[in-house]
Amino acid sequence: MLVPVVDMKLTGQNIASLRTQRGISVRDLQLMLGFTTPQSIYKWQRGETLPTIENLAALACILDVTIDAIVAVECRKTGK
């Protein structure tokens, strides 16, 4: 059986790459998302945490991509 697994590190790399490709600084993204500090963005980019679904939708709009372009999902086999 295959189960979907989010690759947090690759998702973070996608966020960082898409952000820099569009010339958006972490500070700019922080302001666009209404965050008081950039810590969450840095944690996303390092693959430590994932954005909430609301923040993921906002990122997709800001970066002008689909959510699929941000979130890296792989299917892994389970032992069943």
Predicted features and spans:
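Short, basic-rich loop-to-helix N-cap that marks the start of a DNA-contacting helix
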Residues: 47-61, 77-79
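A short, Lys/Arg-rich alpha-helix, primarily the initiator
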Residues: 1-22
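The alpha-helix within a helix-turn-helix
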Residues: 19, 30, 60
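Short alpha-helical DNA-recognition segment
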Residues: 23-43
